[in-house]
Structure formats: C-alpha cells, structure tokens
Amino acid sequence: RICYLAPRDTQICAPGQEICYLKSWDDGSGSIKGKRLEFGCAATCPTVKPGIDIKCCSTDKCNPHPKLA
C-alpha cells in the first residue's frame, strides 16, 4: 500500500499495513491554519479520542490533504 505521510509525500507502507488514514482535529489555538492533520499507514483503522476525526481507506494514495485532493 502507498499512503500519504505528509501533504505531498508518500511512502510504501510496511507489510501488513494495508490501511491509509487521515486524522484531523482542532488544536484549540484558534489558529488561522485550521485543523491539525496526521497522515499514515496502519494494519487497522486507528481508534481515536472524541474530537478527532479520522478517515480510513484501503487503496493507494487515498488519504490526500483535503485541500490538495
């Protein structure tokens, strides 16, 4: 699987990691940058705490930055 790890950077995931994910959350700073983002690979869709949104998918490069999709 090939997943984004940053807005324009991809990586071939480790064996067994067939899920790409994109976590997003408001860091509470009121920043004009908007939400914080975390990209990655996983074996299963990660469990997140309340207030964190997560999108998981299982095709190559399926977790792009929302503004670059």
From Swiss-Prot:
Cell location: Secreted
Protein name as catalogued: Alpha-elapitoxin-Lc2c
Known function: Binds with high affinity to muscular nicotinic acetylcholine receptors (nAChRs), whereas it binds with a low affinity to neuronal alpha-7/CHRNA7 nAChRs.
Superkingdom: Eukaryota
Extra remark: Has the length of long neurotoxins, but only 4 disulfide bonds instead of the 5 usually present in long neurotoxins. This may explain why this toxin has the low affinity to alpha-7 nAChRs of short neurotoxins, which have only 4 disulfide bonds.
Cellular component, GO, one term: extracellular region
Family membership: Belongs to the three-finger toxin family. Long-chain subfamily. Type II alpha-neurotoxin sub-subfamily.
Xref: InterPro entries: Snake_3FTx, Snake_toxin-like_sf, Snake_toxin_con_site, Toxin_cobra-type
CDD domains: TFP_snake_toxin (cd00206)
GO molecular function, one term: toxin activity
Biological source species: Laticauda colubrina
